[in-house]
Amino acid sequence: MRLIHTVAELREEIALAKAQNLTIGLVPTMGALHEGHASLITAANRENDFVVVSVFVNPTQFGPNEDLDAYPRTLEADCKLAEEKGANVVFAPSPKEMYPSEDDTWVEVTGDVTKVLCGRTRPIHFRGVTTVVTKLFNLAQPDRAYFGQKDAQQVEVLKRMVKDLFFPLELRVMPIIREKDGLAKSSRNTYLNESERTAALVLSRSLKAAKEMYAAGERDAEKIIAAVTEGIKAEPMSNIDYVEIYALPELKPIANPLKGSNLLAVAVKFGTTRLIDNVVLEEEE
């Protein structure tokens, strides 16, 4: 496996792969890799001949007073995990490499999909995501790109971008990977102290209860939201940002009673750490 830091080096690697007619899988990450990322790299390795993992803490998707400086940076460990899971290249550029101009060019998806949920409290976040992912798509020219369902809103935004900008690639979405006790794997889990970590288990418990309500026939969105909200509020260390349901795809307003496929998403703070989690409510096949 090769660790590279420049656009020129990545272009060289991609040109060589293309010359051999290799299929390319891209796994964009912000580093601090965990088992969730590992599942993406494993899938990319299984489905493609050549795998690029990008490790870049993208400054443009962090707002003021967010955790850009505190975000964990563990490049050596990231490279080890990426190599173990079958990556051919780790691309770890500097901010200057990815944003060479004084003034930036932006790729922005508009509409409900970027305005609801995290878009309300993090207004510049998705513009930063779509811009950096566009750059990575242009550089790596992947046949397939891999993202996790944990970032469900990001996935919907990127699906829309891929469709609207005619990117010739397949967006592959992999299931949420959880700890044994149910907590969704996240690089930000490292911020939690022991009591916050225990408190955070209320997220997966409440979402599981919602899924059980839905399976038992409950279709009233307000009742499901109320039950999840009540469940989370029962944990005194929790501070709810949102508990909401939107229709899939593209996070449209829901029909009530619920029908089709819907995303139940939560964002909750434990201490200073904001965690997100979600579950899809739909008829079982």
Label each residue range with its predicted role.
Residues R2-M237, Y246-E250, V280:
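Nucleotidyltransferase catalytic core that binds NTPs
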Residues A227-E285:
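Phosphate/ribose-recognition catalytic cores of enzymes acting on nucleotide-derived substrates
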